[in-house]
């Protein structure tokens, strides 16, 4: 039985690329045709490459390798959190902080601070502080959880990274390349396949397309860790309304990295 059928790919809109004027010529081998000024991805290749990606991920998971899902745009953020959590992977679905991988020791210190504040909140220690001090601590807790909550259980650098929207996540990709971390990437028609170790040609803008691809990769991780997937297990479908909480993300005031005491200059 194939990992994903052509019918599933079509139904999820995986074949829709970008306008032809916005393409990257390096994606030409993965493009089937152009219709009404929009490139159409070759789903036969997508299906085959999904088979390859699934098997790679399953075997890596079976070997105990660690995975990190990265996708910070609104359409992907909720799905990233849901699928990574389902299969036991870590994730980043808010703004990528410079040095998150290349300056991991510093980031790890902030993760420990997050855990400390969570413990203080749970045991009532924050509530016992003066009102103003408690508010400051809760604000710090909120910021740390927003940006680092998805990597709270990540004790070491990931062995494999899964990327949604290569062009948006170029900083994360650059750090992975510096560290030699393999990259599995959804590649829309405006992407560069040279920056993906394991390419999956697919629409990286549509929620249903992102859900299908990430869901299959999460299945592979789960299968590698726990054995064959239970066909009767009813995984909750992604609620598209979840993405509403990310609607204002682009309009947010830029988050100051110094609030997390991250010094990206240590990367150099």
From Swiss-Prot:
InterPro entries assigned: Ribosomal_uS2 (IPR001865), Ribosomal_uS2_bac/mit/plastid (IPR005706), Ribosomal_uS2_CS (IPR018130), Ribosomal_uS2_flav_dom_sf (IPR023591)
**Could you tell me which CDD domains the record lists for this protein?**
RPS2 (cd01425)
Q: Where is the composition biased (Acidic residues)?
A: 231-268
**Which region ranges are annotated with the description Disordered?**
228-268
Q: Keyword set for this entry?
A: Ribonucleoprotein, Ribosomal protein
Q: What is the lineage of its organism?
A: Bacteria, Bacillati, Cyanobacteriota, Cyanophyceae, Oscillatoriophycideae
Question: Mind listing the GO biological process terms from this record?
Answer: translation
Q: Name one GO cellular component term.
A: cytosolic small ribosomal subunit
The source's domain of life comes to: Bacteria
Q: Name one GO molecular function term.
A: structural constituent of ribosome
Q: Which organism is it from?
A: Rippkaea orientalis (strain PCC 8801 / RF-1)
The family line of this record is: Belongs to the universal ribosomal protein uS2 family.
Name of protein: Small ribosomal subunit protein uS2
